[in-house]
């Protein structure tokens, strides 16, 4: 069994570097950072945990940035997004970001993705809440094409790009 630690990293929390070092020293397998780009003040969907949304949801730093910092300070701990909201991100840019993080961490990146629950947040990114899982699937498929082919192309309902080249490729094989 493997154990990891997760938290919303903010400018007032323990840093991802300090937590990653402490977890690695204690033999933990992984550190995880969740993602929310922002929290709209209007709310169509209630917080799944009930009540008011905890402050760290509003204040969370970008998970890829904090995990990159943690990766540079550590040697063995795996670095995971828990979860990345890829239906709110561009597939081509995210593929490059994920591959770059996997490269600079020597293959320690774990790409956790999820469909999300905050309808308002998604809509601010141009994502239709009801089609988020189909969009997410296409973005994952498109990213896998980018990661596994020297000349990638993808043609879907939501994601469409002609043959292109992009580097780096991830250290791990998707």
Where do the PLM segments sit?
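Structural motif corresponding to the early beta-alpha repeats
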Residues: 64-72, 78-87
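Internal, glycine-rich beta/alpha segment that forms the wall or movable "lid"
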Residues: 41, 52-53, 77, 81, ...
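N-terminal beta1-alpha1-beta2 module of alpha/beta enzyme domains
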Residues: 1-73, 173
């Amino acid at each position: 069994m493997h154990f990891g630690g997760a938290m919303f990293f903010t400018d007032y929390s323990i840093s991802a570097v300090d937590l990653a070092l402490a977890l690695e020293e204690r033999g933990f397998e992984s550190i995880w950072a969740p993602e929310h780009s922002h929290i709209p003040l209007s709310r169509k969907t209630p917080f799944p945990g009930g009540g008011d949304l905890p402050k760290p949801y509003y204040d969370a730093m970008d998970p890829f940035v904090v995990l990159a910092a943690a990766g540079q300070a550590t040697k063995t701990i795996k670095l995971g997004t828990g979860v990345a909201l890829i239906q709110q991100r561009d597939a081509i840019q995210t593929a490059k970001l994920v591959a770059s993080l996997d490269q600079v961490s020597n293959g320690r990146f774990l790409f956790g993705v999820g469909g999300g629950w905050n309808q308002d947040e998604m809509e601010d990114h141009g994502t239709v809440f009801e089609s988020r899982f189909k969009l997410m699937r296409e973005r994952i498929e498109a990213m896998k094409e980018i990661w596994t082919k020297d000349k990638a192309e993808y043609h879907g309902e939501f994601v469409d790009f002609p043959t292109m080249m992009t580097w780096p490729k991830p250290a791990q094989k998707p």
